[in-house]
Curated annotation (Swiss-Prot):
Belongs to the PsaL family. It is a multi-pass membrane protein. It comes from Prochlorococcus marinus (strain MIT 9211). Its main location: membrane. Pfam families: PsaL. Keywords: Membrane, Photosynthesis, Photosystem I, Thylakoid, Transmembrane, Transmembrane helix. SUPFAM superfamilies: Photosystem I reaction center subunit XI, PsaL. Gene3D superfamilies: Photosystem I PsaL, reaction centre subunit XI. One of its GO terms (biological process) is photosynthesis. GO terms for cellular component: photosystem I reaction center; plasma membrane-derived thylakoid membrane. It is found in: Cellular thylakoid membrane. The lineage of its organism: Bacteria, Bacillati, Cyanobacteriota, Cyanophyceae, Synechococcales. This is Photosystem I reaction center subunit XI. The keyword Transferase does not apply.
Length: 199
């Protein structure tokens, strides 16, 4: 056997497929399922943004375009309020349940203060994003987001988004703190705290 010969071929002859595996109705010029699932560039092939079945599928486009950041018809302040409320609400749990004070009576309050601190840090980063004096980077339309919000990518829009994010983040953290402090969750809280117990 030579070094260029395929070891899976018998005696160097090409493999012959059985007729039952060959579909004779498909012609080479037909546009079929292979072309439908082919990966193509969105606009400029040198940018590196490719249109794949994942990012151009119906479910992905519907999900991404309904997120508060890309949803059409809402103001930048309301976008920031929704995004901040989700961040504040979701960050509260890990800070309260896995923080250093998780086994004390101050676990819920420490989680609240930690979450508000994290929201302040994220808000400071949003402020620093436009601090050099230029407008935020405008995202061009692509196969997933066909109409990105133009009012968000201005200095005024980004400032409104940042203030809404701060208010929503602090409000989401306070709401999660109030929810975890109710009597209805008193039976569940020791179980959740016991999952991450160190001792």
């Amino acid at each position: 056997m030579t070094e260029f010969q395929d070891p899976f071929l018998k005696s160097g002859e090409p493999v012959k497929f059985d007729k039952k595996y060959i579909d004779s109705t498909i012609r080479p010029g037909d546009i079929g399922i292979a072309d439908q699932w082919a990966v193509k560039p969105v606009s400029d092939p040198f940018v590196g943004n490719l249109e794949t079945p994942v990012n151009s599928g119906y479910f992905t486009k519907a999900f991404i375009n309904n997120l508060p950041f890309y949803r059409s018809g809402i103001s930048p302040n309301f976008r920031g309020l929704e995004v901040g409320a989700a961040f504040g609400y979701l960050l509260y749990g890990p800070f309260a349940m896995t923080g250093p004070l998780r086994n004390t009576d101050f676990a819920l309050t420490a989680g609240l203060l930690s979450t508000i601190g994290a929201v302040h840090i994220l808000t400071a980063l949003f402020v620093l994003y436009t601090a050099p004096g230029k407008d935020p980077n405008v995202q061009p339309s692509d196969c997933t987001v066909e109409n990105p919000p133009t009012d968000l990518f201005t200095r005024t829009g980004w400032t409104d988004f940042t203030s809404g994010f701060w208010l929503g983040g602090c409000g989401g953290a306070v709401f999660a703190w109030l929810l975890c402090g109710t009597l209805h969750l008193d039976t569940i809280m020791p179980i959740v705290k016991g999952v991450w117990a160190a001792g």
